From Swiss-Prot:
Main location class: cytoplasm
Protein's organism: Acinetobacter baumannii (strain AYE)
UniProt xrefs under Pfam families: SAM_MT
HAMAP family in UniProt: 16SrRNA_methyltr_J
InterPro entries: 16SrRNA_methylTrfase_J (IPR007536), SAM-dependent_MTases_sf (IPR029063)
Keywords (A to Z) from UniProt: Cytoplasm, Methyltransferase, rRNA processing, S-adenosyl-L-methionine, Transferase
Catalytically driven reaction(s): guanosine(1516) in 16S rRNA + S-adenosyl-L-methionine = N(2)-methylguanosine(1516) in 16S rRNA + S-adenosyl-L-homocysteine + H(+)
Function: Specifically methylates the guanosine in position 1516 of 16S rRNA.
Localisation per UniProt entry: Cytoplasm
Lineage start: Bacteria, Pseudomonadati, Pseudomonadota, Gammaproteobacteria, Moraxellales
Gene3D superfamilies: Vaccinia Virus protein VP39 (3.40.50.150)
Name this polypeptide is given: Ribosomal RNA small subunit methyltransferase J
Length: 279
């Protein structure tokens, strides 16, 4: 079940996007247009003859497109969607023992977990597969709709459908959602934070990493610029600590601590680490 907390777009400027589609997919495009309109996004439908790599190269501006695989974000000759089905090989290799994130979040105890920095949902997908009950919170209407579409497709996949009921999508601002939990005196087992944009001036290692981000993340950075719709997550740490016994923060291995707060415990990997804060 998806939940709308009414605050998803409260801090976002008005959005307007082109949506490209071949005529065979007009009905689907109109559906996405209506959904996005209900979330404050004006979508201009643009039927085209052929949605292919050449068209994307000739139309480099940030836009949406629709084909047989659903809704995509496109720019600079590339297109992106969360594509949860592509994560299946990774999931099949994963276990509670092999995954550092499983140890950090104590997934063996099947926790109720709020992922307050959704991104493409890949970490939440893994955590749900390993047993967690996930509340996946995203405030950007376009990214939320992409996640919603990926979940809808996953529900028709024989493998992914087995645990889709463990992922609840919540259209809300994460800070507002955590504040609401606190005001209602509700708690969860874990809050998971994976801020997408470490502070560049204090984290030169992260700068080098960001130069190598894969195509999905390049497009996500265009949709969620650091000085616009995407924040750095620092303010979420204190809010998270009020509602969870355990807060786990994923960071590049050499990044500074989130909000400059030293964690109680760390799990170190080759490329990233998990910082733990306990209540």
């Amino acid at each position: 079940m998806e939940k709308n907390c009414g605050s998803g777009q409260s801090k976002l400027k008005a959005l307007r996007m082109h949506m490209y589609f071949e005529v065979d997919f007009q009905e689907q495009a109109q559906h996405y247009q209506a959904v996005l309109h209900s979330r404050g996004v004006t979508v201009d439908l643009q039927p085209i003859e052929k949605l292919n790599a050449r068209f994307l190269r000739l139309n480099p501006d940030l836009a949406l497109c629709v084909d047989e695989n659903g809704l995509w974000l496109s720019a600079n000759g590339m297109k992106m969607q969360p594509d949860w089905k592509a994560e299946i090989p990774r999931l099949k290799r994963a276990s509670l023992k092999s995954e550092m994130i499983a140890r950090a979040c104590q997934l063996g105890e099947k926790p109720v977990l709020v992922d307050a920095t959704a991104g493409l949902g890949h970490d939440s997908l893994l955590m749900a597969y390993l047993g967690a009950q996930i509340q996946l919170v995203e405030r950007h209407p376009i990214l939320f709709t992409l996640l919603e579409d990926s979940k809808a497709q996953a529900q028709h996949d024989p493998f992914l459908s087995q645990f889709m009921d463990r992922i609840q999508l919540i259209f809300a601002d994460s800070a507002s959602y955590l504040q609401q939990l606190d005001q209602e005196e509700k708690t969860v087992d874990v809050v998971y934070l994976d801020p997408m944009f470490p502070q560049r001036d204090q984290n030169q290692q992260a700068i080098k990493k960001q130069a190598q981000v894969k195509k999905q993340m390049q497009l996500l950075h265009l949709l969620l610029p650091e000085d616009g719709e995407m924040d750095l997550g620092d303010h979420l740490l204190e809010l998270a600590k009020k509602v969870a016994k355990r807060v786990i923060v994923k960071r590049p291995r050499h990044a500074i601590f989130l909000a400059n707060q030293e964690p109680a415990h760390q799990w170190q990997g080759d490329a990233c680490r998990f910082d733990a804060y306990f209540q």
